[in-house]
Regions:
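Short glycine/proline- and aromatic-enriched beta-strand/turn motifs that initiate or cap beta-hairpins
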Residues: 35-88
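Outer-membrane beta-barrel "beta-signal"
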Residues: 194, 200, 218-231
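Transmembrane beta-strands of outer-membrane beta-barrel proteins
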Residues: 46-52, 72, 81-85, 101, ...
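Outer membrane beta-barrel transmembrane domains
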Residues: 167-202
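Short loop/turn motifs that connect adjacent beta-strands in outer-membrane beta-barrel proteins
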Residues: 35-44, 106, 135, 160-169, ...
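Cleavable N-terminal export/targeting peptides
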Residues: 1-44
Length: 231
């Protein structure tokens, strides 16, 4: 009975992920053709599909090569999006991230539901506060609900710049206190990253972006390299 219950749950979760992918596949050509013509009501539909060589998140490797799909809708600063990876080697962690966000000026706030069936509680809610100072963007994240009882937090500083025709991002990420969620026992820098990207326009209605990123986790003493393409 327990095995059947787990199997049914995973089947339902996988179905939801494939439905998300199908919606993205259908909506992608619609959104690309409508990029030059804004919807009069001010509602914007955003669909992206990234193929990446590995799934790296905040200095941790969570998976191998995968397709990462995002479907979102935005209206007057508010946005709602769904994100999910489909790992090519079949070692899927059954993840769907649902994010409700609001942006005004340089300030942003959001609440993300990390929905994973294989890690304790299926849902972990994370609150985010951020401010973009121009030369650097600062974001603070804290788990406010779920299996994590330590209010695991993470702070990220991202500095964007342009050089030799590429768009770059330098990032520093750290945990302000120890938590099993990030595998740290004190204040720890766990993400030193440098990424570059280049957008290519194909005609007047479609564009794609190639990107690469190098990540070093000083706490775990691990290095990761990622390349990918975004549609």
């Amino acid at each position: 009975m327990w095995f059947n219950s787990v199997k049914d749950t995973k089947m339902k979760k996988n179905l939801k992920k494939w439905v998300l992918l199908l919606v993205a596949a259908i909506a992608l050509p619609v959104t690309t053709m409508a990029q030059e013509k804004k919807v009069e009501l001010g509602v914007n539909l955003d669909v992206t599909m990234d193929v990446v060589s590995s799934y790296i998140w905040r200095g941790q490797k969570l998976g191998n090569a995968c397709l990462q799909t995002t479907v979102g809708v935005a209206y007057k600063g508010f946005s709602l999006s769904a994100w999910s990876p489909i790992v090519f080697d079949g070692n899927d962690n059954d993840e769907i991230d649902l994010t409700l966000a609001y942006e005004t000026g340089n300030f942003s706030v959001s609440l993300t539901d990390y929905w994973m069936t294989e890690i304790g509680d299926e849902h972990t809610l994370e609150a985010q506060l951020g401010y973009d100072f121009g030369v650097v963007g600062v974001n603070w994240y804290t788990n406010v609900y779920g299996d994590d009882k330590e209010y695991a937090s993470y702070i990220s500083l991202i500095a964007p710049f342009s050089l030799i025709g590429l768009d770059w991002e330098a990032e520093v990420g750290a945990t302000p206190w120890g938590t099993d969620y990030y595998g740290t026992d004190k204040f720890s820098v766990c993400d030193l990253s440098l990424g570059a990207s280049k957008e290519f326009n194909i005609g007047s209605w479609f564009s794609t972006t190639l990107f690469a990123k190098a990540t070093y986790n000083p706490t775990a003493e691990k290095f990761y390299g990622t390349v990918g393409i975004s549609f």
